[in-house]
């Protein structure tokens, strides 16, 4: 591909509402492969920045690819600004990263963007591990995410394992998870939404999400769907971003995102699909969820 030297673009730049920084695969529905279509389904125009480029997710028997070279990754971010694509930017969505160096570069870039566009919403899904598999990124990346990305975020969507990792707290019960989330709020976050939350207090056959702000905490429950495709957190976070940008409150955004995610899981299970499916957004197919206000 040509370097572009000697070429001067004419006309108005292509403007992005959201910059989504996360993984990309050739086969599968994870990372930007689900975030981009989810955001577009809400009428948004995402700029897609890959952190890793893989043939598929690592749970398959073969895997090719890896993290993008740091110079490429940094160049992608710089060139979005250089092309004038961020003049109407409304949100930055961060998911899976490929290295600690990427986290540091991204943290500095977000800080510069926030200086120019202070209204931009920054949502970080700190993809680092889960209760079933433990930590599946390097300890260096986990530390860099904690130091460089959490301070830049307005909202965070860790799972229960990641909440414990970020805070060093016990998070198995609802009261413990709320206290841990509020420790993160003390770092400048507006809210924390914990997925697969407080599993010691979760009724059988249910899944819990916990939405925590400085003044309120709410627990959301829905039926567990008997399927476990990859990419559910990526889809939830993209949906959450879209609903917040549409003006929904945090509680309503979490509720709508959860309803669609359960619908997607039910569709995936019905089709016996190895990968997460994204059905059309049919209100008639919306799944039941239950909100439980907690004492503050």
From Swiss-Prot:
Q: Give the catalysed reaction(s), semicolon-separated.
A: pyridoxal + ATP = pyridoxal 5'-phosphate + ADP + H(+); pyridoxine + ATP = pyridoxine 5'-phosphate + ADP + H(+); pyridoxamine + ATP = pyridoxamine 5'-phosphate + ADP + H(+)
Task of the protein: B6-vitamer kinase involved in the salvage pathway of pyridoxal 5'-phosphate (PLP). Catalyzes the phosphorylation of pyridoxine (PN), pyridoxal (PL), and pyridoxamine (PM), forming their respective 5'-phosphorylated esters, i.e. PNP, PLP and PMP.
Q: Which residues are recorded as binding substrate? A: 23, 59, 234
Key words, A-Z: ATP-binding, Kinase, Magnesium, Metal-binding, Nucleotide-binding, Transferase, Zinc
Kindly state the subunit structure of this protein: Homodimer.
Keyword Heme listed? The answer is: no
Descriptive protein name? Pyridoxine/pyridoxal/pyridoxamine kinase
Matches recorded under Pfam families: Phos_pyr_kin
Q: Where does Mg(2+) bind?
A: 136, 162
The organism's lineage is: Bacteria, Pseudomonadati, Pseudomonadota, Betaproteobacteria, Burkholderiales
What family, per the record?
Answer: Belongs to the pyridoxine kinase family. PdxK subfamily.
Q: Is Zinc-finger among the key words of this record?
A: no
Gene Ontology BP annotations = pyridoxal 5'-phosphate salvage
Give the EC class as a word.
transferase
Annotated metabolic or biological route of this protein: Cofactor metabolism; pyridoxal 5'-phosphate salvage; pyridoxal 5'-phosphate from pyridoxal: step 1/1; Cofactor metabolism; pyridoxal 5'-phosphate salvage; pyridoxine 5'-phosphate from pyridoxine: step 1/1; Cofactor metabolism; pyridoxal 5'-phosphate salvage; pyridoxamine 5'-phosphate from pyridoxamine: step 1/1
Record's Gene Ontology CC terms?
Answer: cytosol
**What positions belong to coiled-coil segments?**
none
Q: HAMAP family of this UniProt entry? A: PdxK
Q: Which cofactor does it need?
A: Mg(2+)
What top-level branch of life does the organism fall under?
Bacteria
Q: Where does ATP bind?
A: 125, 157, 162, 195, 222-225, 232
Provide a Gene Ontology MF annotation, just one: zinc ion binding
Known EC number? 2.7.1.35
